[in-house]
From Swiss-Prot:
Protein name as catalogued: Brassinosteroid LRR receptor kinase BRI1
LRR repeats: 90-114, 116-142, 144-167, 170-193, 197-221, 223-243, 244-268, 269-292, 294-317, 318-341, 343-367, 369-391, 392-415, 416-439, 441-463, 464-487, 489-511, 541-564, 580-603, 604-628, 629-651, 652-676
Matches recorded under InterPro entries: BRI1_island_dom, Kinase-like_dom_sf, Leu-rich_rpt, Leu-rich_rpt_typical-subtyp, LRR_dom_sf, Plant_LRR-RLKs, Prot_kinase_dom, Protein_kinase_ATP_BS
E.C. code: 2.7.11.1
Keywords, sorted A to Z: ATP-binding, Brassinosteroid signaling pathway, Cell membrane, Glycoprotein, Kinase, Leucine-rich repeat, Membrane, Nucleotide-binding, Receptor, Repeat, Serine/threonine-protein kinase, Signal, Transferase, Transmembrane, Transmembrane helix
Gene transcribed to yield this protein: BRI1
Organism: Oryza sativa subsp. japonica
Entry's localization field: Cell membrane
Pfam families assigned to the protein according to its UniProt record, in alphabetical order: Island, LRR_1, LRR_8, Pkinase
Length: 1121
């Protein structure tokens, strides 16, 4: 009998082996079929069906059977039809991931197919070309009967609309992620509810375009619901969520919801996390509702309009770990019911940007798990409780802009993990407690605008993590500790407006080159730019920690009302260095510092802003400062400096300099940017001369001591002069000879003899009425037409107001970061465009006028000409030629504007024209002009479809920090900003080249630079193209171009190479715009298009207003990374 049972068992084992082997063979066969169906064969190179399923790339096996397969991130470029016919059929696979694998096609291709019986988790996320309706999703879930987790986030679900019926739907799913798709209609969501989506435990519909919340039925099993980032408006309908009593997480943030706190939520007694932030809710919080939500661990109501006091029932929630009520209008005191439980788990308390009063209650000290405490921008008074030192886990203590008094408690030294101590804008007194030296993790110390005194402690130099030190606007005295140079992480040092004396320690530069990568990471900040010329405040501006605060609410700061903060910029304190890391901001102004400026400060390779003004500094300006290659702002005004301005400063790309009120002498260097600044920046230096100051008088009397040496030099000088005159004569003869051979250019493209524009050294007659008259006045508008080639008629303010119908919205044809643009027809019939600039309260009349005179002289066929400008009070208006077809963005992405498509010939002409205009700014103007915001909306199209670059001078109208601190505003537009701008405040011509590369991609692909529908939330056009260039490269081109003329494919590829070169991550490897033009010319030279087209294209390149390609190749010196 035993032998019989043994024989039967052996038969079963053998049968199992046979079945397993057959199943494995079936899996291998399906994988081989899939491999053959994948267009990108290189992605699965090295495997064939004979290798077995377990050796397939991304395979996971258990006991010899294929149980999981992950091809996430592999650029398959496969059709979903092939996936459904092969990978979904794998019999033993439990987990299948094709996340970000470039799968495309329709989800409906799975219709009729059956999934493998073991499949439990399917991840198809991040495939932007995978499209279908929510009904297709339900059908896929039904086809895979055992499926529990389905992830389709970042695809194109919703692009197709649902039909009728409901089907078995989603009932079997445990988790469904449809976030970041295209679900728009309310009917889609209602269909899903009818199809049983309420039975799904985890449902993520964030980042779609849903506009309403239907009533969820049969949703007792729903535990997680995320509808954030949609377009839901109005109040949450009563009863919409009342059946979902099992909900543990509800996220309705970033919508347009309004009304009072939704009453239904009080019935969701199982809630662990509730997020209603970034909506328009208002009214008081119902205390009785929160009394029922005893399981809440996270509550976020920030960025709403809730008011009244904070209910005790909120503060005393027993399980609460995170409480964020920031940016509302709560009033009253901080509840004393906080952390009543000695075992409180609260680790985040955000109450900033409200109207809270009273003191900091002792109850806060009971929150022993607290990691982050932010009470900034309130009206909290009293002293900082010494008991806060009991919060041993605290990392962030942020109390700026309150009414706190008294001394900084020494007990804070017990918080040895403290990283951010931010107490600006209070009334604190005393000195910095020496005990704080124990807080060795401090990263950001900000004590500005208090009444602190005493010396700056030398022990600060021992804080190896210290990155930001702000002690400005206090009464600190004594010398600057040389030990600060030992702070190897220090990037921001602001000591302005104190009573410091002694010399500037050369040791401050010791940390240069010793910094690590990623020193300060992740803290939101706002930088308030201060216009010192008309302000009661001092220094270049104020850096504030800015977590969960509305920018508009900064107007409540008394200091902002006193100071003339011209602009504010929001960003994140994340800074990395490629090499030679150093300080980036140094402000020691308004002190009593004396002695010479140490030349070692020039060793700070990344230093961008240096303000040493309003001190007692003496000696000469060290030429070594010019070794700080990234220096953008330099203020040495109101000192006792003498000697000349170093010629080495000509190599700096300065955007702001102030050397006024010193004892400097000599000539202002003409090279570089120094001569482009207004004379106010050099005034009150009795020995200084040269533009923009009066010219140097070389015949002025000399002292007797100098007479003999000058006599000895006379012979040599006369010889040099004769040589120079002869050389000048030869140059003139050559120029005349060349000029006689060149055909006349159009009048509007008149050039200087050497094709180079130099800033004006003289001022033509102008119309000097200052435009301060009211509308009823008869005085002429102050329009400066110096060197403008086609003077406008005499215009009054009333003329422009009448031409734009009072700047009526109906006349507005555009809007951007610099202001609104209006179409206007003047009385003589001429149609112009009038740009009404945003108010620039920090821009003086002289600076504005000088800049306008410079911009007005720049004429080129591919630049939009400035016809005139005017100013009245704070108003600034610019008058331009009107461009009939608007911008390239309008023409390319909104074709109804001109009612026609752009074929490749037109796009090529636009690409070359825009490049020519930008090359002219970079290489034909001295100093060169950096556009700073090159994008398709700044490429205008005239009636001949000729590209004209606009706004090329706008960034210079703003102050340096406008163009060097805010990559999110003036220094670029999302999608066009080069990667280095996120690490450096400094704009360069190579940044413009990158932005031009994006414009060229737009012309080639027909796609905008950013579109989450096409590229996903974390991608853009550049990233999308770079992904596709690894696959079938021609897929990136606009299908309309190849459909119209397949023969242009090779030419498109050549232009794509140019675009990719412009988009190199390393600026030094990008071509100059002159090189780009040369590459265009090479393409034309080798083009196989017909002679007529070729001739036209060649003309479009060579006929630049000033012969950009014919000029000697004066390649700009490469910027060092």
């Amino acid at each position: 009998m035993d032998s019989l049972w043994a024989a039967i068992a052996a038969l079963f084992v053998a049968a199992a082996v046979v079945v397993r082997g057959a199943a494995a063979a079936d899996d291998a066969q399906l994988l081989e079929e899939f491999r053959q169906a994948v267009p990108n064969q290189a992605a699965l190179k090295g495997w064939s069906g004979g290798d077995g399923a377990c050796r397939f790339p991304g395979a996971g096996c258990r006991n010899g059977r294929l149980t999981s397969l992950s091809l996430a991130g592999v650029p398959l470029n496969a059709e979903f039809r092939a996936v459904a016919a092969t990978l979904l059929q794998l019999g033993s696979v439990e987990v299948l991931s094709l996340r970000g694998a470039n799968v495309s096609g329709a989800l409906s291709a799975a219709g009729g197919a059956r999934c493998g019986s073991k499949l439990q988790a399917l991840d198809l996320s991040g495939n932007a070309a995978l499209r279908g309706s929510v009904a297709d999703v339900a059908a896929l879930a039904s086809a895979c009967g055992g499926l529990k987790t389905l992830n389709l986030s970042g695809d194109a679900v919703g692009a197709a609309k649902v039909g009728g019926g409901g089907g078995p739907g989603f009932a079997g799913l445990d988790s469904l992620d449809l976030s970041n798709n295209k679900i728009t209609d309310d009917s889609d969501l209602r269909w899903m509810v009818d199809a049983g989506v309420g039975a799904v435990r985890w449902l993520d519909l964030a980042l779609n375009r849903i506009s309403g919340v239907p009533e969820f039925t049969n949703c007792s099993g729903l535990q997680y619901l995320d509808l954030s980032g949609n377009l839901i408006v109005g109040e949450v309908p009563g009863g919409a969520l009342s059946d979902c009593r099992g909900l543990k997480v509800l996220n309705l943030s970033f919508n347009h919801l309004a009304g009072v706190f939704p009453p239904d939520i009080a019935g969701l007694t199982s809630l662990n996390a509730l997020n209603l932030s970034n909506n328009n809710f208002s009214g008081e919080l119902p205390g009785e509702a929160f009394a029922k939500l005893q399981q809440l661990t996270a509550l976020s109501l920030s960025f709403n309009h809730f008011n009244g006091s904070i209910p005790d029932t909120v503060a005393s929630l027993p399980e609460l770990q995170q409480l964020d009520l920031s940016s509302n209008t709560f009033s009253g005191t901080i509840p004393s019911s906080l952390c009543q439980d000695p075992n409180s788990k609260l680790h985040l308390l955000y109450l900033q940007n409200n109207y809270l009063t009273g003191g900091i209650p002792d109850a806060v000290s009971n929150c022993t798990s607290l990691v982050s405490l932010d009470l900034s921008l309130n009206y909290i008074n009293g002293s900082i409780p010494a008991s806060l030192g009991d919060l041993g886990n605290l990392q962030d203590l942020i109390l700026w802009q309150n009414e706190l008094e008294g001394e900084i408690p020494a007990s804070l030294s017990r918080i040895q993990g403290l990283e951010h101590l931010i107490l600006d804008y209070n009334g604190l007194t005393g000195s910095i407690p020496p005990e704080l030296a124990k807080c060795t993790k401090l990263n950001w110390i900000s004590l500005a605008s208090n009444r602190l005194s005493g010396p700056i402690p030398s022990w600060l130099g021992k804080l190896s993590y210290l990155a930001i030190l702000k002690l400005s606007n206090n009464s600190f005295s004594g010398p600057i500790p040389p030990e600060l140079g030992d702070c190897q992480s220090l990037v921001w040092l602001d000591l302005n407006s104190n009573q410091l004396n002694g010399s500037i320690p050369k040791e401050l530069a010791k940390q240069s080159g010793k910094m690590n990568v990623g020193l300060i990471v992740g803290r939101p900040y706002v930088y308030l730019r201060n216009d010192e010329l008309s302000s009661e405040c001092r220094g270049k501006g104020s850096l504030l920690e800015f977590t969960s605060i509305r920018p508009d609410d900064l107007s409540r700061m008394p200091s902002k009302k006193l100071c003339n903060f011209t602009r504010m910029y929001v960003g994140s304190t994340e800074y990395t260095f490629n090499k030679n890391g150093s300080m980036i901001f140094l402000d020691l102004s308004y002190n009593q510092l004396d002695s010479a400026i140490p030349g070692e400060l020039g060793d700070m390779f990344y230093l961008m802003i240096m303000n040493l003004g309003h001190n007692l500094l003496s000696g000469t300006i060290p030429s070594r400062l010019a070794e700080a290659k990234k220096l953008a702002v330099l203020d040495l005004s109101y000192n006792q400096l003498e000697g000349p301005i170093p010629n080495s400063f000509s190599a700096l790309s300065l955007s702001e300099i102030n050397l006024s009120n010193n004892q400097l002498n000599g000539t202002i260097p003409e090279l570089g940017s120094l001569a482009t600044f207004p004379k106010s920046q050099y005034e009150n230096n009795t020995g200084l001369c040269g533009f923009p100051l009066p010219p140097c008088d070389h015949s002025s009397p000399r002292s007797s001591n100098d007479h003999q040496s000058h006599r000895r030099q006379a012979s040599m000088a006369s010889s040099i002069a004769m040589g120079l005159l002869f050389s000048l004569f030869c140059i003139i003869v050559i120029i005349i000879a060349i000029g006689s051979k060149r055909r006349r250019l159009k009048n509007e493209e008149a050039s200087t003899s050497r094709d180079i524009y130099i800033d004006s050294r003289s001022h033509s007659a102008t119309m000097n009425s200052d435009w301060r008259q009211n509308l009823s006045g008869t005085n002429l508008l102050s329009i400066n037409l110096a060197a403008f080639e086609k003077p406008l008629q005499n215009l009054t303010l009333a003329d422009l107001v009448e031409a734009t119908n009072g700047f009526h919205i109906a006349c507005q044809i555009g809007s951007g970061g610099f202001g609104d643009v209006y179409k206007a027809q003047l009385k003589d019939g001429k149609v112009v465009a009038i740009k009404k600039l945003i108010h620039v309260s920090g821009q003086g009349d002289r600076e504005f006028t000088a800049e306008m005179e410079t911009i007005g002289k720049i004429k080129h066929r591919n630049l939009v000409p400035l016809l005139g400008y005017c100013k009245a009070g704070e108003e600034r208006l610019l008058v331009y030629d009107y461009m009939k077809f608007g911008s390239l963005e309008d023409v390319l992405h909104d074709r109804k504007k001109i009612g026609k498509k752009l074929n490749w010939e037109a796009r090529r002409k636009i690409a070359v024209g825009a490049a020519r205009g930008l090359a002219f700014l970079h290489h034909n103007c001295i100093p060169h002009i950096i556009h700073r915001d090159m994008k398709s909306s700044n490429v205008l199209i005239d009636e001949q479809l000729e590209a004209r670059v606009s706004d090329f001078g706008m960034a210079r109208l703003m102050s340096v920090v406008d163009t060097h601190l805010s990559v999110s505003t003036l220094a670029g537009t999302p999608g066009y900003v080069p990667p280095e701008y996120y690490q450096s405040f400094r704009c360069t011509t190579k940044g413009d080249v990158y932005s031009y590369g994006v414009v060229l991609l737009e012309l080639l692909t027909g796609k905008p630079p950013t579109d989450s529908a096409d590229f996903g939330e974390d991608n853009n056009l550049v990233g999308w193209v770079k992904q596709h260039t690894k696959l079938k490269i021609t897929d990136v081109f606009d299908p309309e171009l190849l459909k119209e003329d397949p023969s242009v494919e090779l030419e498109l590829l050549e232009h794509l190479k140019i675009a990719c070169a412009c988009l190199d991550d390393r600026p030094s490897r990008r071509p100059t715009m002159l090189k780009v033009m040369a590459m265009f010319k090479e393409i034309q030279a080798g083009s196989t298009v017909d002679s007529k087209t070729s001739s036209a294209a060649a003309g479009s390149i060579d006929e630049g207003g000033y012969g950009v390609l014919d000029m000697p190749l004066r390649e700009a010196k490469e910027e060092k990374d």
